[in-house]
Regions:
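Catalytic toxin/effector domains delivered as secreted proteins or via bacterial secretion systems
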Residues: 3-20, 38-203
């Protein structure tokens, strides 16, 4: 068969434009989703933080199921909490469990993020404080840091914090992230024999 060179070139150009258009649409959709996430986070923060602790709404009233699914997937490899040696000895070890019994809660981050935070700190304890949403100096006189990993979360009711928890400090923000940008959630209190405890070589 006889082919028209100009027609072939035109077809190739149209195919290229179609591919570029498809990529742009994917890029635009991704950017829009990110902008929406940022917009909603800004929407959450201001009004919710004005509500006194103890009266803040359940996160399920302002976070959709898609967001929750994506957020909880971060914890597929387990959850981790970092405490001072003092807090571990006087509370967790003394009680035989980690968490706050008053409201049956424990703030945690994904284990994979704990690995990153510790590595990126380069031994700087202030960096860990900042990333985990603690005031500067919070860990300074605690005698070192203890890492507690929880692998099996199946019976621990993984959920977003509302900001009403006993452990929610003045730097808490809505949406499941620390003020330092690390994903967080809460579990029920965890027996120490269901955890793995190790020391972090930072003081």
């Amino acid at each position: 068969p006889k082919f028209n060179r100009e027609q072939i070139l035109r077809n190739l150009e149209e195919s290229k434009l179609a591919r570029e258009s498809s990529k742009f649409k994917q890029y635009a959709a991704k950017e829009y989703a990110l902008a929406e996430e940022i917009r909603y986070k800004n929407y959450w923060n201001e009004p919710i933080l004005k509500i006194p602790k103890g009266s803040r709404p359940d996160p399920k009233t302002y976070v959709n199921s898609e967001y929750l699914t994506k957020h909880f997937a971060e914890f597929d490899e387990g959850a981790t909490v970092i405490q001072t040696e003092w807090a571990y000895t006087n509370y967790s070890e003394a009680n035989g469990f980690v968490g706050v019994p008053d409201d049956n809660t424990l703030f945690v981050m994904p284990t994979k993020y704990a690995d990153k935070v510790i590595k990126n700190s380069n031994g700087n304890i202030n960096y860990i404080e900042e990333k985990l949403g603690f005031p500067k100096g919070y860990f300074k006189y605690g005698g070192g840091l203890v890492r507690i990993d929880v692998e099996d979360l199946s019976d621990l009711d993984l959920r977003l914090p509302s900001g009403n928890e006993t452990g929610a400090n003045s730097m808490w923000i809505p949406g499941g992230e620390t003020s330092g940008g690390v994903p967080e959630a809460i579990l029920n209190t965890v027996p120490l024999d269901k955890t793995r405890v190790s020391r972090i070589g930072i003081k």
